């Protein structure tokens, strides 16, 4: 019986087609290797600098507290010294920002968003030392600020520094390494790699140019940053609240109610931040002496507040586990919440180098715990655990204020290692975001960036108008 055997020509055609298919598969990935290598460098540097920043802030705080402990038995020395030490530390931060790098003031995240759109400068040779040393001063003083804003801005500036050092001129590399550094910075601040990636994709979605090259670079940078962080700090979650019980299905409606509450609180909080910024601007009018003295007064008051009510001062990471454990009454939780709202507004809106993520997480924890404890009294048949509402509240305020629910959900779950609470987290954060949007609230960082750009345009217009007048005289 005759069998059909492929001819030599047919075999050659098959080999040729197979070769073309392999080449297409290989060539489909156009990611330049140089960008991925530089992303790894940026992530490593950001992780190292982020860890160094954390250690430096802790060292300053310990030195300040140690000095106060030495005079703890002498009230006539303790109170003035608490004010003076915190005031001096804060004044260092305010002075450096105002004198050398105004863009290093505040969180720094809006500056990175503006730089991604080529609307704001990236002067890494100024911002890196000013943000690092200035943040040591303000955070070390016990001001109500977080370290995530500085590490995000430091990471973005490290990305631009690497770009300049290795003389990479393409616009794609410039944009990609800036975004990579920012994502690595958030990961280094919170030991939350997935949240760092989502932060770039979600919060910076209008500015981030999503493609296969940029997203691979962001992944690479975040991986390296997280590895560096865990080498120095271990793999434990940075907020220890223990393993909480899951939320029964018949209690999920309470998380929606909590989300509605935060959906109302978020826009109000954003409005207060912006109005407080305007108030400070009217006070100092851009004059460096007034600005530094104002910052010193705020820092000194935080130092005094740290003696009176330690929970009301500082970034809030130490407060979160205590509050989530139900160690405070509902009334005390609400009192600390209101106090920390005021201190957060004063510290962040004054332009101090420091972030607002950590203070918002603490505020969300306080209000969420208060709601959970009240609900446990009103609905005893549910056997509610206030800590689960604390976790949901942590992400809800950030979701309503920053308008980044996915980032808020993942960030809190990574920080607390309570992934089983993902469903109530989704319900709370989504409810908060939708209601905040319905009420007309605007994302905080985008609003701050828009105000910064408007001020920049006004200054440029005034400069252009004054130039001809100077030439005619």
From Swiss-Prot:
Periplasmic side: 70-76, 233-252, 310-329, 377-386
Cited HAMAP family: CLC_ClcA
Residues reported in the UniProt entry to bind chloride: 107, 356-357, 445
Keywords: Antiport, Cell inner membrane, Cell membrane, Chloride, Ion transport, Membrane, Transmembrane, Transmembrane helix, Transport
Site features described as Mediates proton transfer from the protein to the inner aqueous phase, chain residue numbers: 203
Keyword Transmembrane helix: yes
Matches recorded under Gene3D superfamilies: Clc chloride channel (1.10.3080.10)
Its job: Proton-coupled chloride transporter. Functions as antiport system and exchanges two chloride ions for 1 proton. Probably acts as an electrical shunt for an outwardly-directed proton pump that is linked to amino acid decarboxylation, as part of the extreme acid resistance (XAR) response.
Family affiliation: Belongs to the chloride channel (TC 2.A.49) family. ClcA subfamily.
InterPro entries: Cl-channel_ClcA, Cl-channel_core, ClC
Chain span(s) of sequence motif Selectivity filter part_3: 355-359
NCBIfam families: PRK05277.1 (NF003640)
Protein name: H(+)/Cl(-) exchange transporter ClcA
PANTHER family: CHLORIDE CHANNEL PROTEIN (PTHR45711:SF6)
Any GO molecular function: antiporter activity
Chain positions of motif Selectivity filter part_1: 106-110
Membrane topology: Multi-pass membrane protein
Top-rank lineage group of the source organism: Bacteria
Localization per record: Cell inner membrane
Catalysed reaction, written as an equation: 2 chloride(in) + H(+)(out) = 2 chloride(out) + H(+)(in)
Pfam families: Voltage_CLC
GO cellular component terms listed in the entry, alphabetical order: plasma membrane
Transmembrane region(s): 33-69, 77-100, 124-141, 148-166, 215-232, 253-281, 288-309, 330-349, 355-376, 422-438
Complex formation: Homodimer.
Intramembrane segments: 109-116, 177-189, 193-201, 387-401, 402-404, 405-416, 417-421
Main subcellular location of this protein, as a coarse class: membrane
